[in-house]
């Protein structure tokens, strides 16, 4: 099949749908992969890395949407992309349609086939493609929060991890899922006092066991 990888155009989105290593795997399976010119540049991948992996380079997103049977993206299609999606074209990406009425209507009108990464579920009811995004979000939340506590950001001037003779901050995390767990990892690493609130007692016990194992591993 012809698989197209356009450059992401959503503001502040610098990732790309496929890495050169993923392209190499798909090409070895007999697929044709087309990557937009400099599509992976902001993610640290050069055109040459994609061509070495077996991909072809397209001059524009329009060429990709016009030629590919499958479109592989990271974030939801923007208006200009929706207008290029063809009937029966398959689109893989994070869609988050619940709060995007216009996008939902546009995709329905295009009669395309859309697979949202965030709703892909494994046999155990977990969301394996959403978990990595949630992990990043959790870790970034503490990093961003610590930055906002600085005085020059109109914060309280609090150093989250404290300093010799100065108490650190207290972090309260609502929810002990993937986001919450990863937020706790970073906050704990910064030596803040961390409290997690979750409605599931079983999940809280699981997190406590993970913490205890982490301490044991450090001692050994």
Predicted segments, located by residue:
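Residue-level detector of alpha-helix initiation sites
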Residues: 76, 136, 177-179
